[in-house]
Regions:
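Ubiquitin-like/PB1-type beta-grasp interaction modules and other compact soluble beta-rich domains
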Residues: 1-92
Length: 93
């Protein structure tokens, strides 16, 4: 198991009232599952689709700055010291 830091950005930081949380896990999915088991009640349905059991399309999960969608998504393996970032994608002009 790897010791990983989950960094919470924008809406997640506001809802959870923390900047980061340390977890132990083997994959990105392990870390996200632990996070949701602790904090699901603080997230709106717009952020998390209960039926699909996944974050909505606007949620961005980065592993060391890389989008997990371009890796192995939730099955991406982790190593000690990895940093995950959980964010709501924002755009402006």
């Amino acid at each position: 198991m790897a010791k990983v830091r989950l960094n919470l950005l924008n809406i997640f930081q506001l809802r959870i009232n923390q900047k980061s949380i340390d977890y132990n896990g083997k994959t990105v999915g392990d870390i996200i599952s632990q996070f949701l088991s602790e904090y699901r009640d603080k997230l709106d349905d717009e952020l998390f689709d209960v039926k699909k059991k996944e974050f909505n399309a606007q949620i961005l999960i980065l592993l060391n700055g890389r989008n997990i969608k371009y890796l192995k998504n939730y099955k991406t393996n982790l190593k000690d010291g990895d940093e995950l970032y959980l964010s709501y994608a924002l755009a402006g002009g």
